Amino acid sequence: MKYITVLGSTGSIGTQTLEIASEQPDKFKAVALSAGRNITLLTEQVKTHKPEVVAIEDENLIEDLKDNINNLDLDSAPLVLGGKEGINAVAAWDKADTVITGIVGCAGLIPTMSAINAGKNIALANKETLIAAGPIVIPALKKNNSRLLPADSEHSAIFQCLQGLPNYENADFSTGVMPKGLKAIHLTASGGAFRDWPVENLKHVTVEDATSHPNWDMGKKITVDSATLMNKGLEVIEAHYLFGTSYENIEIVIHPQSIIHSMIEMEDSSVLAQLGWPDMKLPILYAMSWPERFKTNWKRLNLSEIGKLTFKEPDEFKYPCMGLAYAAGKSSGTMPAVLNAANEMAVEQFLKEKISFQEIPTFISKACESHMENLNLSPELEDILEVDNWARIFVKQEIKKGKKYVSI
C-alpha cells in the first residue's frame, strides 16, 4: 500500500489521480488532499477517500468546509487547514510516501518544494516547478534523498524509454545528469487545436476555439498552451532539467494522433518510443506505482484500429512560443521563470478576452526582452518568486496600456 498526497485534488490531474486510487484500493490510499476553492468537490472527495488532512487555499472557505465535513458524519473527520501554510503542511504530511502535484502554474512551486524538503517522492504533473526553479529543485532533490517521477505523458514516456538504457536500474533520472547512452530526445506534440488551420486564420481565433483540444481532455490553460505550442516549449525546458539533455538535443515533432508520447534516440542510432492512448491516467499511474506496473482494465492499444501514425516538423511561424521557450531555456537562470509567468498572465488575459490569441507570444516576448538586463544566472528561491511576480505585473501593465501589438 502506498500512501499518497494529492495537491490540487479538485483539478484535472487531481480528480484523475483519485479515480486511480478508487480503482486500485489495495494499492493506494489518499491520506492528504488540497484544493483552491472548490469545497463542494473537496467535500465529496473527503467522503469517498477519508483522508487524514485536507487544506483549502482560500482561507475564507475554511469554516464552510468544516461545516460540510461535519455534515458527513464520518467516524473520524480529517484535520482541516487553510491558506498557503495549510497547503504546505499537506504537501509535507508525514504519513504520505508520494506527493502528486496537480496544482496548475507556478502556484505549485512552494508546495512542491515543501514536499521535497520533507523527503517525499514527487509525481510531478506541475511542470512549472522545474521550468521556473530547475536550478533550485534538482539540488534539493539530492539533498533530501527525494525522487522526482514525471506524471505528464511526454516525460513519462521518456522516463519509461530510458529504462532500456544500460544500468538503468542504478540510475537516478531526476539529477539533471544526462544518462549514459542517450543521444537525443524527441518530444511529440499533437499540434493543438489549430494544427490544420492556415496561419492567416489565427487572427480570428476565439476562446472557445483555443480551449477545444482534438485529442486530450485537459484544463483551459494547458489547452491554450497546446494551441500555441508553449506547452511543448515548456516541456523542452523540463526535459533539459529532468534528463540533463542539452537544448540542441531536444527536438519537437508534430504527431497528430498522439499515440507515440515521446521517443529517445540512443548513441547507436536506435530509437525507443512509448505508445498508448491519449489518456493522462496512464502516466499518472506509472508515476504512482513505479518501479512496479499495476494491472488495469483500461482499453488496450490497437494499432490496426489506428491505421497510421504520421509526423511533421512544427511551423516556427505558426508557433512562435516554441522559439521563445528554447531561447529562454538557453538563457537559463531566471529567464524560464519569466517566460512561464508571462505566459500564464498572457493566457489568463486571453481567456478573459482582453487580448487576442496572436498577442499571447507578443507579450511574452516583451517580458523576456525587458528582463534580459536583470537576468540572474544563479538564483535563489526568493529570486524566482520575485521575477515571477514582476513578469505577471509587467504583462498586465503592458496590456492595460491598451496598445495594439502585432504578433511576432
UniProtKB/Swiss-Prot annotation:
The keyword Manganese applies. Coiled coil: none annotated. GO terms for molecular function: 1-deoxy-D-xylulose-5-phosphate reductoisomerase activity; manganese ion binding; NADPH binding. InterPro entries: DXP_reductoisomerase, DXP_reductoisomerase_C, DXP_reductoisomerase_N, DXPR_C, DXPR_C_sf, NAD(P)-bd_dom_sf. It comes from the Bacteria. Pathway: Isoprenoid biosynthesis; isopentenyl diphosphate biosynthesis via DXP pathway; isopentenyl diphosphate from 1-deoxy-D-xylulose 5-phosphate: step 1/6. 1-deoxy-D-xylulose 5-phosphate binds at residues 127, 153-154, 190, 213, 226, 231-232, 235. Its EC number is 1.1.1.267. Keywords: Isoprene biosynthesis, Manganese, Metal-binding, NADP, Oxidoreductase. It is an enzyme of class 1 (oxidoreductase). One of its GO terms (biological process) is isopentenyl diphosphate biosynthetic process, methylerythritol 4-phosphate pathway involved in terpenoid biosynthetic process. Its cofactor is Mg(2+); Mn(2+). It catalyses: 2-C-methyl-D-erythritol 4-phosphate + NADP(+) = 1-deoxy-D-xylulose 5-phosphate + NADPH + H(+). NADPH binds at residues 10-13, 36-38, 126, 128, 219. Mn(2+) binds at residues 152, 154, 235. The keyword NADP applies. PANTHER family: 1-DEOXY-D-XYLULOSE 5-PHOSPHATE REDUCTOISOMERASE, 1-DEOXY-D-XYLULOSE 5-PHOSPHATE REDUCTOISOMERASE, CHLOROPLASTIC. HAMAP family: DXP_reductoisom (MF_00183). Belongs to the DXR family. NCBIfam families: Dxr (TIGR00243), PRK12464.1 (NF009114). Catalyzes the NADPH-dependent rearrangement and reduction of 1-deoxy-D-xylulose-5-phosphate (DXP) to 2-C-methyl-D-erythritol 4-phosphate (MEP). This is 1-deoxy-D-xylulose 5-phosphate reductoisomerase. It comes from Prochlorococcus marinus (strain MIT 9312).
